Amino acid sequence: MERFPLKPVLLAVGLLASAPFAQAASTLVYCSEASPAGFDPSQFTSGTDFDASAETVFNRLTQFKRGGTEVEAGLAKSWEVSDDGLTYTFHLRPGVKFHTTDYFKPTRDFNADDVLFTFERLLDPEHPFRKAYPSESPYFTDMGLNESIKSISKTDEHTVVFALNKVDAAFVQNLAMSFASVQSAEYAAQLLKEGKAGDINQKPIGTGPFVFKRYQKDSQIRYDANRAYWKPEDVKLDHLIFSINTDAAVRLQKLKAGECQVSGYPRPADIDLMKQDPNLKVMSQPGFNLGYLAYNTTHAPLDQLKVRQALDMAIDKPAIIKAVYQGAGQLAQNALPPGQWSYDAKIKDAPYDPAKARALLKEAGIKEGTTINLWAMTVQRASNPNARLSAQMIQSDWGKIGIKANIVSYEWGEYMKRARAGEHDVMIYGWTGDNGDPDNWLGVLYSCAAVKGSNFAKWCDPAYDKLVQQAKLSSDRDERVRLYQQAQVILKQQVPITPIANSTVFQPMRKEVQDFKISPFGLTPFYGVSLAK
């Protein structure tokens, strides 16, 4: 699972909040659901952060076709793979310009040095920029790229070679993902010289379709069109604005009033109302997502399998789906969605059985009234439109078996930061696939390598991990399916998570919005989008 000067009449903050934006024909306002934690895509894993940075400001060597999962050329115009699958040679697109802003003015075009800086910074903890601005790259390590990439070199200004330690069947797809956005080496050098390395996360410079202008947390982000963009047909807006509001009801009001043209994460209960509005249209598609609970297996008593089994079978999932998803969710029984190849349809939930759950807790020596902290997101996600209500229903279910759940919430950025540090007992989370490969689920969310990243269960099972790693090394689809399905069986037996639902994705917008495409990866891209006059 992130916009730019308006006409003068709208520049005042008061007018920005109350006047319809329709009068600024080339300005699109997106009512977004949360503030990004920053603008350096390598540091994050959520759609909120990627929408505000990777999908607007940056490009990658490869990219996914808009609205699809097929990989196409990006900053690399072409590439070759060696016969042994260990060497990738990328030929870079010439003439690509980095953004010119009031805080950076590039003196050269994009070249191989920028690719080297981007990935060497991620690979090397001792890299000068990492020393000046220490930061984690959770997705990069979750994907195992820190181990699979042996070296990066350039043969000339427009040719880059990646040498791998081991075959990675999804390497080209991985480079199309948001976290692999290419940074400017020249800008990084300027920041180091100025002693402001941290600005890479606050004042982004990229080659993407929109140029960052300014950001006011919990209020708005402004971007201008990149008129020097290497793919000019994708830039059809003059200005882009993210108007941030965590309240779905407020976002709906603003959409209906014309104060924004596109709105994120609607409440399921509002969908029919939106469809009845003659000024709105609602796009939808089956979600490539999963809403789930992650049990922190390093915290007692969740380190006991019987406790996790008890909590899992005590949850009335159909009731949650009815109340929270309101017809837009499907019961999830596996740790990845049905649309993902290698999905094992034979895997089923343990029956809902509070009595057996109580017995398991007794066998595990758990006393009546034991308290567990249950974390709930404060923002809506495609995978869970109302985490707070979900938590309250789970709290009630667990209360029936003698477990007291204390619901804990934080602002989104803090929620993610603390969860990666392992402060939670149980957390509500969700994931939308990023590249169409099973490893994006079974490796990124549940592997040993991801324990410090997006594996919020902090679960590391050697037998499971061996299967996932073997599958990643194979280029034989049938062999990968066999290995991944074996891994799914282990994961279901060990209960590091409780799958809750796969949800339908709805994207409401005003009818003047043209050529918007829903991303199968849960992102909200605005390149290629226009407004009817």
Regions flagged by a language model, labelled:
Residues 195-201, 227-273, 391, 404:
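Ligand-site clamp/hinge motif
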Residues 77-129, 161, 301:
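Aromatic- and charge-enriched surface segment that lines or borders ligand/interaction sites
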Residues 210, 296, 302, 331-364, ...:
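Structural transition elements
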Residues 65, 224-228, 287-310, 314:
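A bilobed periplasmic-binding-protein/Venus flytrap-type ligand-binding module shared by bacterial periplasmic
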Residues 26-32, 52, 169, 216-220, ...:
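Detector for C-terminal structural segments
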Residues 91, 123-188:
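Surface-exposed binding/hinge segments that line
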Residues 35-52, 75, 102-106, 169-181, ...:
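A structural "hinge/loop" feature
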Residues 31-84, 120, 127, 205-207:
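N-terminal lobe/hinge region of extracytoplasmic solute-binding protein
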